[in-house]
């Protein structure tokens, strides 16, 4: 299995689906499933039963995971770019294909 090219804290653009074109920050990643959760994107409504923790119950809006193929890292100007790995100074770093700049993290 190859390394996940998108990590927590990355700014990404949604490439397809109902939220196409929206940008957000990755809040959580699931490398084994190749999925990420992006803030404010792919929001689903869950019906919650009343419980001791939540005595009121009701509707709850939750961000659902997206497959990594549906998102791309956003450049400084907000456009999507692919990512490749390079070895610089003995360290494996992520590099934006369009701009050639190193992605932090």
From Swiss-Prot:
This is Large ribosomal subunit protein uL24. Keywords: Ribonucleoprotein, Ribosomal protein, RNA-binding, rRNA-binding. Part of the 50S ribosomal subunit. Belongs to the universal ribosomal protein uL24 family. Disulfide bonds: none annotated. PANTHER family: MITOCHONDRIAL RIBOSOMAL PROTEIN L24. One of two assembly initiator proteins, it binds directly to the 5'-end of the 23S rRNA, where it nucleates assembly of the 50S subunit. InterPro entries: KOW, Rib_uL2_dom2, Ribosomal_uL24, Ribosomal_uL24_CS, Ribosomal_uL24_KOW, Translation_prot_SH3-like_sf. PROSITE patterns: RIBOSOMAL_L24. It comes from the Bacteria. SMART domains: KOW (SM00739). Pfam families: KOW (PF00467), ribosomal_L24 (PF17136). CDD domains: KOW_RPL26. One of its GO terms (biological process) is translation. GO terms for molecular function: rRNA binding; structural constituent of ribosome. Transmembrane segments: none annotated. One of its GO terms (cellular component) is ribonucleoprotein complex.
């Amino acid at each position: 299995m190859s390394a996940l090219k998108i990590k927590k804290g990355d700014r990404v653009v949604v490439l397809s689906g109902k939220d196409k074109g929206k940008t957000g920050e990755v809040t959580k990643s699931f490398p084994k499933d190749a999925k990420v959760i992006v803030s404010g994107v792919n929001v689903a409504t869950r019906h919650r039963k009343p419980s001791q923790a939540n005595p009121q119950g009701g509707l709850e809006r939750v961000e659902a995971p997206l497959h990594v193929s549906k998102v791309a890292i956003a450049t400084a100007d907000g456009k999507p770019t692919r990512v490749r790995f390079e070895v610089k100074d003995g360290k494996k770093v992520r590099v934006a294909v369009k701009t050639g700049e190193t992605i932090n993290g």
